Amino acid sequence: MKLKDFAFYAPCVWGTTYFVTTQFLPADKPLLAALIRALPAGIILILGKNLPPVGWLWRLFVLGALNIGVFFVMLFFAAYRLPGGVVALVGSLQPLIVILLSFLLLTQPVLKKQMVAAVAGGIGIVLLISLPKAPLNPAGLVASALATMSMASGLVLTKKWGRPAGMTMLTFTGWQLFCGGLVILPVQMLTEPLPDLVTLTNLAGYLYLAIPGSLLAYFMWFSGLEANSPVIMSLLGFLSPLVALLLGFLFLQQGLSGAQLVGVVFIFSALIIVQDISLFSRRKKVKPLEQSDCVIK
């Protein structure tokens, strides 16, 4: 098996974030967790490497901001103002946004199977979560929508732009994590004080988020994007709430209702369709993400 075949690793690991955050990290420090997920891993990966071409710096910053920096900041802003289920529901719209952007920016045709998978996954998310009866915070809804659009745009632009000639995937991942961390850093410093005490349990949680949850996850994610369309990758995101649900059931004594089990069936149906789309795309020989040979002035 090749790295591209492990694209599912990233959304599965990201599905553990809520469990790790609530069980291992200091309370009410989400931006610090986001910063530690991005900046240290990025520095490790680019340390000692050559600088990218000058014309690529702005592209790497845009990709890092969309895929990581803006996404994390908006996501945590929304999480403080909305129930987690609402954030997940808004996030389930991401595949539909990616389908539209792929059509507009990559001229990829819209397939019926893509739409069916996106709708099936969205229905599954609705069944997994419980929506509140109280009015929703408008600012939280806007932030959640911006987080969803940010990651969707980052996926499509990463596919469109590729990566600089001669740059390895690890280094490409590192630059995005580094640039994303630079976006998060001033927001964290201005809005969130550091914790008074950091325990060994906290350190273990931060280490997990930084290495398996970020460095390895984003490396696998971008490697998968080389061989698959952004639509397929966005549909794999439905794995995250499934993993979160499973961890809650196994370790947090959270029960499973009949509706949630039906939701699991819908999401698995969407993932089966994703596999079918992937096989179809490979037969059609969709051009993979390549290193860019263009000279940018």
UniProtKB/Swiss-Prot annotation:
**Which family does the entry's similarity section mention?**
Belongs to the EamA transporter family.
- State the source organism's domain of life: Bacteria
List locations, semicolon-separated: Cell membrane
Source organism per UniProt: Dickeya dadantii (strain 3937)
Name of the featured protein? Protein PecM
- Please report the record's description of how this protein sits within the membrane: Multi-pass membrane protein
Transmembrane regions: 6-26, 38-58, 60-80, 86-106, 116-136, 138-158, 167-187, 203-223, 231-251, 261-281
* GO CC terms in record: plasma membrane
Question: Which Pfam families would you find in this protein's record?
Answer: EamA (PF00892)
Please verify whether the record's keywords include Membrane. yes
InterPro entries listed in its UniProt record: AA-Vitamin_Transporters, CO/AA/NH_transpt, EamA_dom
Q: Main localisation, per the record?
A: membrane
